[in-house]
């Protein structure tokens, strides 16, 4: 039976082995992805929006290529993973614009993507549900730091935007908990970074402009 990238990592971690790549080209694709991400980070730090408009979506496309080369389309959890990455790509493209409409579109795309990540984690198997408390702790800390986000969202877009942001918080919380519950440290750290980065983004969007 074929295994998805996430399932192969889960299986290998339980055997204390390193998973074997499904394609010999995955190493090159991973290196290319890392290079694009490094370039995108440089563009963000240097405020090179012209470069970021290219590297941000390119990084997600490269991640999709890595997942595909790893055999993600062969299993249910892998297909959920691919769907999540596609919606992440859409969200990144939407957030390259500054308008409120693009922000809401990006928020919606990421919300759907996070639901697909949850489905991928659940399908792959949550062997250590107790670890979900780590995800809950990360979410709680982020909400404490960003306690002004919802009032800021209400001031910026009224009840509709407030409801959308609140729904997003719930979904990303579910992703954090389910990600940690897989029992995989790297997955847990990854979802935690997502929570932190989205909190920073929301603070910049809804809190700092009002300060």
Describe the residue ranges of each PLM region:
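Polytopic alpha-helical membrane-helix bundles and their juxtamembrane interface segments
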Residues: 19-211
